């Protein structure tokens, strides 16, 4: 296939985290710069790209299921171009080609900005695997963003941590921070385009700047997430700032104080704790104790008493005892999270914990996950009660898909909120809403 016969329609299916979603937006922008048009239906597309996740085994198996269907279609439509990007592509590399030889391109997440160059090789008749570690270059194309109100901006790629259960450093590479100038320029453009909220993204976002040159007179890194928040805070048009995901090792009081002082920074913090037991945390190689984690949350609430806290937790880690699991339950009960993403431990290839001989049964993991989720829902419902009859600022993002007489958006604390209104008139507006009904993870109210 040559560039002149490039397929005109494309479809991207994205699995996994916000980083993957942001990568997909950038790759969509590249494809549209190349002349491709979006297709809602993958079965009518000439190029299909799966941006994959390898955090858990079920996500990986789902990818192979999708690929199997499209591989059959390619036998009937040989001009179909099949691309696998993201973390499964990085982890499996050429192994995917042996399993699905119909693939045209396998590319790791570090190569997202090189999509056009890689497709040029494909259209010249090559089957391409791009998984070698590289320095991530700035993307000069405009992402095809899924929203016209909120936007993600990557500020740091990769991860230098070596958690014993996690495959991310293997598939996303070492930390690479973007320059403050590049981040500012992207956000300035977003403000001019009418975006109201920006979420800064990174695997360990509070580690931002450690790899950039320069130190201060006091010996700290010259570029940090705290400094960046001050730098981008006053960009015209941007009304709200968020950031994710934070690592407890790098979440400082200086950062907390900045979030308190800067009015555009929303009072919502996503800080995974993974386990409430110190021995499990040590086995996970997380680099902190549950006491350290509790201290961070206490400090946040000292500066911002009403702040919303969300996190991630893993149950059924190899060797986790019932008593250790109960320490996780105790931490969740004590802190009271607004939202908690929970998962049963899933062994990932290439990670130390995957080959340990003290794996727990699926029955134990399932039981613990169910018990944790029950507590999470209870605590979230209790946390929601504080919103009842309060007036909250809601950024309207879209129409309620279940009720077209309502719009939906999020509070500064990241609570999904519904109220009656016309999306055409209200989209992108900050509206004061009196909360009349509360649920564990969402609110309903009336515009005032």
From Swiss-Prot:
Q: What sequence ranges are listed for the domain TRAM?
A: 385-448
Where it mainly occurs, coarsely classed, is cytoplasm
Q: Is Kinase set as a keyword in this record?
A: no
Localization recorded for this chain is:
Cytoplasm
Keyword Transmembrane set for record: no
Signal peptide start-end: none
Q: Could you say which residues bind [4Fe-4S] cluster 2 here?
A: 159, 163, 166
Q: Which UniProt keywords apply?
A: 4Fe-4S, Cytoplasm, Iron, Iron-sulfur, Metal-binding, S-adenosyl-L-methionine, Transferase, tRNA processing
Q: Where's the Radical SAM core domain?
A: 145-383
Any Gene Ontology CC annotation: cytoplasm
Q: Which cofactors go with this protein? A: [4Fe-4S] cluster
Q: What is its EC number?
A: 2.8.4.3
Question: Which InterPro entries does UniProt cross-reference here?
Answer: Elp3/MiaA/NifB-like_rSAM, Methylthiotransferase, Methylthiotransferase_CS, Methylthiotransferase_N, Methylthiotransferase_N_sf, MiaB_methiolase, rSAM, rSAM_horseshoe
Please list the residues that bind [4Fe-4S] cluster 1.
17, 53, 87
Q: Which NCBIfam families match?
A: miaB-methiolase (TIGR01574), MiaB/RimO family radical SAM methylthiotransferase (TIGR00089)
Family per record: Belongs to the methylthiotransferase family. MiaB subfamily.
Protein name, entry field: tRNA-2-methylthio-N(6)-dimethylallyladenosine synthase
What organism does the record attribute this protein to?
A: Crocosphaera subtropica (strain ATCC 51142 / BH68)
Task: Please name the taxonomic classification of the source.
Answer: Bacteria, Bacillati, Cyanobacteriota, Cyanophyceae, Oscillatoriophycideae
Question: Gene of origin?
Answer: miaB
